[in-house]
């Protein structure tokens, strides 16, 4: 299997398993009174489950952490800050703008990744790649269209959503930079998740008594699915450029509602979901056929 086919396979798998991971984690969230600190706490426990899975399936990758260069360690430790800030900006944006608007704007992170990859990694920007992403964005817009006008949009809310897209886009560029330096996906994942725990847990320890141990064990178990999703995402970056990896990963927007329908009987518009899926697939196929994907 050549690099482009591997990239498409792993990118697609990352979207599928992210959709499943987010759906299951979302159901756990409904068991709690959600606050920012509780959300950070659950993220830490989820990432603990991912790190534990890495340590079980690839002990050698954990040992390789000590062989990383200083710039690699610093870069990886910045990822949870960017990811955490992005999620914070997204959550704050939904207070002041409609959920649909927040989803659409924050889902532009592949565009930020595409520009960041051009600046920092010298990846080329081809007309086919740009056209493909625009079609993907149209598909994403349709998935959230019904929620676009739930409430009035404010400048502050729009700014938060834009910042979320920027932080998520830069996160992907760092992933690619580190993987280009021959750091294994499992080593990167382990240090990235441990960094999240170290950074987030001290701030959330005060609410430990408010979360049931059974909920914590459940979210940690879901971390196994998160591991598969994140590993596939890393492999997509390894075998392709930033734009394709991110645009395939963003298909979780389709898979999430589908899993929610199959597992929890949540209502969805099947025809709308199919139309969105077709558009997102066409857009990703154009990016896949771009000569700049390797």
Segments predicted by a language model, with ranges:
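Helix-helix packing/entry segments at the starts of transmembrane helices
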Residues: 9, 13-15, 42-45, 100-108, ...
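Juxtamembrane helix-loop boundary signature in multi-pass membrane transporters
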Residues: 1-12, 108-166, 274-294
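Juxtamembrane C-cap of transmembrane helices in multi-pass membrane transport proteins
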Residues: 17-34, 49, 88-97, 105, ...
């Amino acid at each position: 299997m050549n690099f482009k086919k591997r990239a498409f396979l792993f990118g697609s798998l990352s979207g599928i398993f992210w959709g499943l991971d987010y759906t299951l984690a979302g159901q756990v969230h409904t068991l709690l009174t959600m606050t920012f600190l509780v959300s950070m706490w659950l993220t830490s426990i989820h990432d603990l489950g991912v790190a534990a899975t890495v340590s079980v399936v690839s002990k050698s990758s954990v040992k390789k952490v000590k062989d990383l260069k200083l710039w690699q360690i610093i870069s990886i430790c910045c990822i949870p800050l960017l990811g955490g800030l992005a999620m914070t900006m997204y959550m704050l944006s939904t207070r002041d703008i409609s959920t649909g608007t927040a989803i659409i704007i924050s889902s532009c992170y592949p565009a930020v990744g595409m520009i960041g990859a051009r600046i920092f990694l010298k990846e080329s920007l081809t007309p086919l790649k740009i056209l493909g992403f625009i079609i993907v964005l149209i598909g994403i817009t349709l998935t959230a269209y019904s929620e676009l006008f739930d409430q009035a949009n404010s400048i502050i809310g729009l700014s938060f959503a834009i910042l979320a897209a920027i932080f998520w886009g830069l996160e992907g560029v760092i992933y690619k930079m580190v993987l280009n330096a021959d750091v294994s996906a499992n080593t990167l994942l382990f240090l990235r998740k441990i960094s999240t725990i170290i950074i987030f847990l001290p701030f959330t320890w005060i609410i430990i008594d408010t979360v049931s141990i059974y909920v914590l064990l459940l979210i940690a178990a879901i971390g196994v699915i998160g591991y598969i999703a994140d590993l596939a995402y890393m492999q997509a970056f390894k075998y392709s450029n930033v734009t394709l990896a991110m645009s395939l990963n963003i298909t979780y927007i389709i898979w999430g509602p589908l899993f929610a329908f199959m597992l929890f009987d949540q209502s969805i518009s099947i025809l709308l979901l199919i139309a969105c899926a077709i558009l997102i697939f066409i857009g990703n196929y154009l990016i896949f056929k771009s000569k700049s994907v390797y």
